[in-house]
């Protein structure tokens, strides 16, 4: 038995926000004290309450990592009252940022145990900064350990922002004790922390939920997560950071497999612009504060928690796509009836990062030929996966009306352009590519499915990224 109660988008927020932008709108920050709101289309994604895990406290504090930021929070601290088991997934970019290297080393040294905090700064990536950058990242972690009264390494560190610049490390170290003294387990504290890790994001991304596990049906566990990212998103991984926290007890040996599976079907299945960053990190911490039996890889609880964590990570990662720089559409691409999952995933990824597909969607043009072209040139696809005369393409409207068939078994349909245009007016769209089982279709085989989430390309994306550093 497994019960889920999710607290996610709950309509207009109780508190107010202001979006402060630079000359051309690329830096978006938040001030909860101002009597304004975030943009109407984004407001629905901000939770007005949450159910947060026991034993975790968080804070968002202003440092001024970027000189132009004179009052907005840009230092996030997540801390557990008790040591956690932990795991993390990192960028595959060869130029791994200093905080990535330090966090990897800490997890290796501690063997996924004894992790107590995560410290994150926005405004500077501390990437490609040499030995000095490594020392800066280590000093951030060590300062938090000092606040915790711990001599062994127990803090993971993350950074996000412009590559190739050193951190104003003295300013950050001076404010870490303030961040520590501000730790709390309230909704406003979690929201402020989620805001503190934002860069070009238009809204903070935070969700939480409760769940139960088969071995302890009488215990209600909580899971909370925050993430940031709006550009340079095409995992494995992209410019996104994320922290997932639960008060369920999870054995250290189970943490990495749980996270890897969840990330493969969520954060590694999204794309905004096809670029892979130097800093990506998704960390998962479990402190066991709610009690119960530890989840191990051989227990029934493992399967139950895997379902919870994967679904949760999908919901969180989709907020990144919805906040894609300049995005006007949230697109789901579903590859059905493939002979193998990995080939389906590669095809979905190719469609998701195609500039021609993305610009056609922005222009509300039902140019299915661009989708089919991407299917045909997808790299690394197993022979016999794509058989042209078995391939079909459709648009699935969000209103529940019948799908609009564009291509059926390799034959083009007469498309109702008026209906196609109406479907493309909506913010949400699903593209279905049915491979008909590929070469295995005649045998009734080939039922694998892969899903990717992505957004369109607009004029604003070029504006934001053409002026990022100014």
From Swiss-Prot:
Q: Where does it localize? A: Mitochondrion matrix
- Give site residues, Involved in the stabilization of negative charge on the oxyanion by the formation of the oxyanion hole: 160-161
Q: In which pathway does it act?
A: Amino-acid biosynthesis; L-arginine biosynthesis; L-ornithine and N-acetyl-L-glutamate from L-glutamate and N(2)-acetyl-L-ornithine (cyclic): step 1/1; Amino-acid biosynthesis; L-arginine biosynthesis; N(2)-acetyl-L-ornithine from L-glutamate: step 1/4
Q: Name one GO molecular function term.
A: glutamate N-acetyltransferase activity
Q: Which GO terms describe its biological process?
A: L-arginine biosynthetic process; ornithine biosynthetic process
The protein's matches in InterPro entries, at most eight in alphabetical order, are given as: Arg_biosynth_ArgJ (IPR002813), ArgJ-like_dom_sf (IPR016117), ArgJ_beta_C (IPR042195)
Q: What is its main location?
A: mitochondrion
User: A Pfam family for this UniProt protein?
Assistant: ArgJ
Instruction: Give a short account of its post-translational modification.
Output: The alpha and beta chains are autoproteolytically processed from a single precursor protein within the mitochondrion.
Active site (catalytic residues): 239
Keyword field: Acyltransferase, Amino-acid biosynthesis, Arginine biosynthesis, Autocatalytic cleavage, Mitochondrion, Multifunctional enzyme, Transferase
The reactions it catalyses are: N(2)-acetyl-L-ornithine + L-glutamate = N-acetyl-L-glutamate + L-ornithine; L-glutamate + acetyl-CoA = N-acetyl-L-glutamate + CoA + H(+)
Name any GO cellular component annotation. mitochondrial matrix
Q: Recorded E.C. number(s)?
A: 2.3.1.35, 2.3.1.1
Q: Where is this site: Cleavage?
A: 238-239
The family annotation for this protein states: Belongs to the ArgJ family.
Protein role: Catalyzes two activities which are involved in the cyclic version of arginine biosynthesis: the synthesis of acetylglutamate from glutamate and acetyl-CoA, and of ornithine by transacetylation between acetylornithine and glutamate.
Other information:
This protein may be expected to contain an N-terminal transit peptide but none has been predicted.
Quaternary data? Heterodimer of an alpha and a beta chain.
HAMAP family attached here? ArgJ
| Name of the featured protein | Arginine biosynthesis bifunctional protein ArgJ, mitochondrial
């Amino acid at each position: 038995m497994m019960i889920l109660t999710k607290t996610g988008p709950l309509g207009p927020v109780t508190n107010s926000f202001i979006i402060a932008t630079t000359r051309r709108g690329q830096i978006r920050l938040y001030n909860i004290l101002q009597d304004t709101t975030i943009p109407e289309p984004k407001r629905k994604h901000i939770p007005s309450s949450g159910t947060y895990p026991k034993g975790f406290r968080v804070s968002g504090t202003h440092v001024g990592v970027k000189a132009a930021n004179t009052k907005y929070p840009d230092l996030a601290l997540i801390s557990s009252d008790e040591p956690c088991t932990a795991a993390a997934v990192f960028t595959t970019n060869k130029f791994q940022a200093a905080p990535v290297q330090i966090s990897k080393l800490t997890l290796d040294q501690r063997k996924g145990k004894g992790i107590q905090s995560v410290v994150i700064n926005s405004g500077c990536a501390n990437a490609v900064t040499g030995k000095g950058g490594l020392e800066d990242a280590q000093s951030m972690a060590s300062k938090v350990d000092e606040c915790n009264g711990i001599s062994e390494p127990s803090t993971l560190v993350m950074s996000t922002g412009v590559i190739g610049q050193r951190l104003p490390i003295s300013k950050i170290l001076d404010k870490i004790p303030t961040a520590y003294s501000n730790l709390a387990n309230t909704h406003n504290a979690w929201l402020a922390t989620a805001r503190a890790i934002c860069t070009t994001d238009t809204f903070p991304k935070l969700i939480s939920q409760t769940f139960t596990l088969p071995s302890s049906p009488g215990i209600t566990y909580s899971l909370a997560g925050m993430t940031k990212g709006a550009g340079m998103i095409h995992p494995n991984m992209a410019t996104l950071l994320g922290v997932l926290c639960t008060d369920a007890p999870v054995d250290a040996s189970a943490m990495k497999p749980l996270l890897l599976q969840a990330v493969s079907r969520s954060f590694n299945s999204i794309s905004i612009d096809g670029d892979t960053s130097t800093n990506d990190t998704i960390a998962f911490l479990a402190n066991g504060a709610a009690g119960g039996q530890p989840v191990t890889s051989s227990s029934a609880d493992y399967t139950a928690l895997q379902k919870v964590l994967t679904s949760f990570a999908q919901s969180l990662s989709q907020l990144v796509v919805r906040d894609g720089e300049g995005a006007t559409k949230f697109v789901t691409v579903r590859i059905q009836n493939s002979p193998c999952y990995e080939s389906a995933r590669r095809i979905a990824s190719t469609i998701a990062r195609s500039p021609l597909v993305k610009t056609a969607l922005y222009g509300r043009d039902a140019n299915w030929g661009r989708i089919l072209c991407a299917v045909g040139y997808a790299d690394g696809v197993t022979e016999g996966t794509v058989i042209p005369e078995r391939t079909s393409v459709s648009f699935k409207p969000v209103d529940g009306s019948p799908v609009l068939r564009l291509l059926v078994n390799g034959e083009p349909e007469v498309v109702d352009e008026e209906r196609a245009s109406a479907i493309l007016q909506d913010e949400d769209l699903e593209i279905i590519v049915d491979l008909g089982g590929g070469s295995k279709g005649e045998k009734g085989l080939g039922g694998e499915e892969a899903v990717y989430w992505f957004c369109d390309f607009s004029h604003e994306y070029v504006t934001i990224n053409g002026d990022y550093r100014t």
